[in-house]
Amino acid sequence: MVRRVVTGAHYGLRDWLAQRITAVVMIVFTLLLAAIFIISPPHDEASWKAIFSNRWMRIASFLFLVSLFWHAWIGMRNILMDYVHATGIRLTLQILVILSLIFYTIWSAEILWAMEMA
């Protein structure tokens, strides 16, 4: 009789669920934005600003972007863990991915919330 010992951190289910949840958030936002563009297509900069000047739209956009970046992090981390076997290179690449995603999140927030002042 063979006894099977299951070890590991069981990140697979959590990652799978996080990717599905972030995908649903992105799909809902995309459908919302598509509906807005179909109902009232923006033709100039003032129309674009009108769409994104509402606080709820900026919050929804930021939630979309955080979901996008979290989704990207999970995917990139899994790709790097699966295909980059040298620990030093993998760690360096993961740090670069994290730093770039943090930078893009802050930059996106700055763009979204700076619209209020413009």
Feature-to-residue mapping (PLM):
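Membrane-embedded alpha-helical bundles that constitute the cytochrome b-like, heme-associated redox core
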Residues: 1-118
